[in-house]
Amino acid sequence: MSLLTEVETYVLSIVPSGPLKAEIAQRLEDVFAGKNTDLEALMEWLKTRPILSPLTKGILGFVFTLTVPSERGLQRRRFVQNALNGNGDSNNMDRAVKLYRKLKREITFHGAKEVALSYSTGALATCMGLIYNRMGTVTTEVAFGLVCATCEQIADSQHRSHRQMVITTNPLIRHENRMVLASTTAKAMEQMAGSSEQAAEAMEVASQARQMVQAMRTIGTHPSSSAGLKDDLLENLQAYQKRMGVQMQRFK
């Protein structure tokens, strides 16, 4: 796996699924391929994206700044600085300075990532802030190692939280989660269907599923009534793809 592929993988792992994630993935690909060279426009686009947490925006802004060539005098962006200041916690700053000194001695991506993984997310973000604000310099490889370590920690905590929700025994939470997943799957089906004639059927199935979820929420239904809803939708989607000549074995 190339360095940039690895960075893209880690960064995207902390972005919530949805159309915005696909957009961000495209931007990252363009930046890494050298196709997008307007850092100012890129940062303005990032700043106005909804849904993303300030820290995720800060990390993406840091990655864009590392990758896109820019004039030396280009202003640093406040939304990135605020996200990478470790909540103004002096402990985070102390640890970030110690980490920075260690990173100065590293020359490889993996070496930097290993060193960084033993620090808290707050210290890692603050260390990124030091580099972003030009208070310290490390090689791009080392900076990317720091980015990936931070993303790994965030993704770990997101995974723990997600797993807790998946294994919860509360039937109301499970019911709502199944309806949310069915609704987002239906939305994805509508986007993929496009405008071909064969798409009408897929669009109809997706539309019915969304109406069903809406009705279930409106009248209130038994928590077990949503079981299998998303899987039924995915089966329909795969059948539609087969007819279109697209073979995607796993969508779950």
UniProtKB/Swiss-Prot annotation:
Keywords: Host nucleus, Membrane, RNA-binding, Viral matrix protein, Virion. InterPro entries: Flu_matrix_M1, Flu_matrix_M1_C, Flu_matrix_M1_N, Flu_matrix_M1_N_sub1, Flu_matrix_M1_N_sub2, INFV_M1. A motif (Nuclear localization signal) lies at residues 101-105. SUPFAM superfamilies: Influenza virus matrix protein M1. It is found in: Virion membrane; Host nucleus. One of its GO terms (molecular function) is RNA binding. GO terms for biological process: viral budding from plasma membrane. GO terms for cellular component: host cell nucleus; membrane; virion membrane. It comes from the Viruses. It is a peripheral membrane protein. Homodimer and homomultimer. Interacts with NEP. Binds ribonucleocapsid by both interacting with genomic RNA and NP protein. May interact with HA and NA. Cannot bind NP without genomic RNA. Most abundant protein in virion. When expressed alone can form virus-like particles in transfected cells. This is Matrix protein 1. It comes from Influenza A virus (strain A/Mallard/New York/6750/1978 H2N2). The lineage of its organism: Viruses, Riboviria, Orthornavirae, Negarnaviricota, Polyploviricotina.
